Amino acid sequence: MSNLIRGLSENGGVVFCGVDSTAIVRKAEQLHKTSATCSAALGRLLTGAALMGSMLKDDRDTITLRVSGSGPAGVLIACTDGTGNVKGCIDNPLVELPLKENGHLDVGGAVGRDGVLTVIRDNRLQKEPTVGQVPLVSGEIAEDLTSYYAYSEQVPTVCALGVLVDKDLTIACAGGYLIQLLPGATDAEITQLEQNIAAMPSVTEMLRAGKTPEDMMQLALKGFEPNVLDERDVAYQCDCSHERTEEMLLSLGKKELEKLRDEDPNCEVVCHFCHTKYQFDLNELVQKAVDKHETPVPTEENESV
């Protein structure tokens, strides 16, 4: 069964996207060894990124979410592409705070309520990425994404995200949904949608009860006769490789590589997103940089016919 769906109301006025991101957040917790609060914080951001990525028009387009708050967790980053697959990292994954009065994890306290959410959209058809920034509303992630859509994209949006962490720090369940009103929505439709959402249990309550993303859609869009547009599997997926890492190092240039080589000819690069380690011989990289620089660029004069 696919873990992400996109749907549309019968009249085309309301878009829904929902995901069960339990496997994604479990993978993130295993990779980053996060505390309960940081699992919830990073898990919510990854879930939101998966939802946003699935709404891109081209699978090769990307979105990067960067949450920079005043809290002890530091900077959180989540990246996604048009498939909805995600990867992410957090500066201080071991930060833990006391539970809030309602017994919930204090994600806002870990992230910080003062700060900025930056959304970078990289469309392959545009020369430069589009960057949007909004102040954090609460640091709880869902409210911050809702604020981004309202102020940066002027799209009325409802975002709900949830991560339930067990006492042994494993992830019991995680998921979320995005609902957007398209132009032309009537006051009656807005009122109906507000009533539906107010009557819904939390995301984690629904997931623990065995509800699927499609079940969430039926509850949220009750009375709107929603139809599933498409469904897919999304996962935590890092796209790093030895080749890409080498290209990144070569982009530093010969002089910078020589400085690094003089300090230590053996270079290790660790991916922030999946912690894969790549080993390089800087003597070899310096030579590759020289060869790359000396390789003549084909011109009409030296091209053979």
Q: For each of these PLM feature ranges, what is it?
A:
Residues 1-230, 298-305:
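Interaction interfaces in information-processing and related assembly proteins
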Residues 198-305:
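Cys/His-clustered metal-coordination modules, chiefly Zn-binding fingers
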